[in-house]
């Protein structure tokens, strides 16, 4: 019981850090959009034409889609295959459980969720880092 409490506390702290990183990414996107559409004096930017706006938005959406695809592949490889290699008794999870004893325990679900959040944090960090490296003037984040 004590171990479960420690796991819950650790996962709670981990979730808070994950949501902090996610809110930071949203803030960066809002700053990027504001910088894209408005000049410094909060007037609509006339110097940029609509095709330039569209090019920047398509670039940003394309970047996001690529990282979502990479993240999906990494997460599926990270979750499914190592579990089957290191714990072959979990192979039955690919089929429907025959009785209630075949379902996952709470600690297994908690540790899987924790690993998933860690992978998502790394994915967000790598995505924002790649945008900063490839096109540093477009991300709108002043560090």
From Swiss-Prot:
Bilayer topology annotation: Single-pass membrane protein
**Predominant place of localization:** membrane
Q: Superkingdom, according to UniProt?
A: Eukaryota
The protein's name is Putative uncharacterized protein YNL235C
The membrane spanning regions, by residue number, are 65-85
Q: What else is known?
A: Partially overlaps SIN4.
Per UniProt, the keywords (alphabetical) are: Membrane, Transmembrane, Transmembrane helix
Q: Which GO terms describe its cellular component?
A: membrane
* Subcellular localization: Membrane
